[in-house]
Each structure stands twice: as structure tokens, then as C-alpha cells.
Amino acid sequence: MKVAITGKGGVGKTTLASTLARLYADEGRTVLAADVDPDANLGLALGLSEEEVNSIVPVSKMKQLAKERTGANDQNSFYKLNPDVSDLPDKLAKDIHGVKLLVMGTVDTGGTGCVCPDHVMLKAIMTNLVFRRDDVVIMDMEAGLEHLGRGTASMMDQFIVVIETGARSVQTYVRIKELARDIGITKVRVVANKIRDESDREFIRSRIPAEDMLGFISYSPTVIDADRKGLSPYDCSPDALDEIRAIKAAIDAKE
């Protein structure tokens, strides 16, 4: 199972990504959670301490490793565009509650289409992840599909957009669905978070096709409190855990 979770900052995609990862780990599955958001906080949501999270060097910052794998150096402008990185996900991952956390980071291309060694290695690792046939891979991504090439995207089982009740949030779903269609992906699912009442549900249902909906997560002060304290929502909110468990069942049913 390969799942990409995206959405604007603050909508709760990391809550969903971290809880799904731990639920799959509870089943004894090999789970690799990749944090591909520049505001990397998936580690905290999985249960790492702030000190542990701060000690992790994102893959995108491992410039020497990128040079070694691509063969790049100061004297040579040529390097491998498809380096062997098959050993890196397991070697670089941090284990937490049965989940292997891989903090990817991002490479700022400035809109130039950069193919620098850092970017090449990052792309190669992400491609490698989706070909790990028997593993569960969950990617926590910023609002877009820029990190996924057409080939990588075609291997994903689920694209999930996390939204809130609001026109701007719904527009994010519309934009990502258009981007997905451009690279050949026709199925984009939605999880609506921070739902307070039935009117919120009706707002979402009136704007999102029923076949795209995976489920709802209620507004939860305990989840917000867990975030403030740097704790895992999995450990703090039984209600949210039950709702995400139901969303997981819907994901598995669509596999």
C-alpha cells in the first residue's frame, strides 16, 4: 500500500499520516513514513521528542551523500541521474513505534527545473519507496504533487487531500485533482478534518463527489492539545483514533 497525503499547512494531514502509519504498524506491516513537507513535524506526531526530531538531518541536506551516490564532484559536471539508493531508506530511517520515519526535506529549485545531485537523490529515493512491493509507504507532503514524477505517481495506490470546512480548502482539493489528472492520476480521495457538526458535513458533501470521500475527522481539543505538547495524536485521542481507523478501512477497501 502506497499512500500520498497532501493538503495545506494546518489542516491535519500530519495527524492523519502519523496515525495511519501506526495503525498499519499495529498489524505487523513494514511501514515507512516519509516526511516530504518543508515544515517537517511528522516525527513529533509519531511520538519522537523535540530533541530527537531536531537531531534528524533531512535527506535533502546530505550533500556529501548525494555526491557519493551520483558521482558528482567539483571537477566533473556529469553525474548519474539514476543512482542506486536501494539501501538508503532503511539505513537513514528512524524507528519509532514500529514505523520507519524518513525525513526527506525538500530541494529549493526556484522554478528552474533543478537536477542538482541533492534533487536527483531525493527523487531516486522517492521512486525507490513506491517500488517496495510488500511495504506500506505513507508520504506526508505539502499541498501539491511537485515531488512526484509521472512514473512514481502511477505507482501510488491512494492520493488523499486533507481539507477543512471552507471554500479555500475545497479549492485546494480542486487544484490538486487537476494536477493529478495532468500526470495521469484519476482518483484523488478526500478526508475532511475538524468537523464540528452536521452542517460542516453537509458543506463538504455538497462540494466533494461521494466517490472521492474517504471519511470525516471531528474537531478534537485533545488532538490540538497533543499538538501543542508535541505528543502523538494516536496516544491522546481515542475518538480521533476510531475515526481514522474507519478511514483506514475505507482505504484498504479501495486498494
Model-derived regions: residue spans:
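Hydrophobic anchor at the beta1->P-loop junction of P-loop NTPases
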Residues: I5
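Walker A (P-loop) phosphate-binding loop of P-loop NTPases
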Residues: G10
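Conserved lysine of the Walker
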Residues: K13
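Hydrophobic positions on the alpha1 helix immediately C-terminal to the Walker A/P-loop
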Residues: L16
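N-terminal phosphate/diphosphate-binding loop that engages ATP/GTP or pyrophosphate donors
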Residues: L23-H97
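Switch II (G3) loop of P-loop NTPases
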Residues: M104-G110, C114-V115, M126-L148
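Inter-motif core of Ras-like GTPase G domains
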Residues: A124-R133, L148-A167
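C-terminal lobe/tail of nucleotide-utilizing enzymes
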Residues: L179-E255
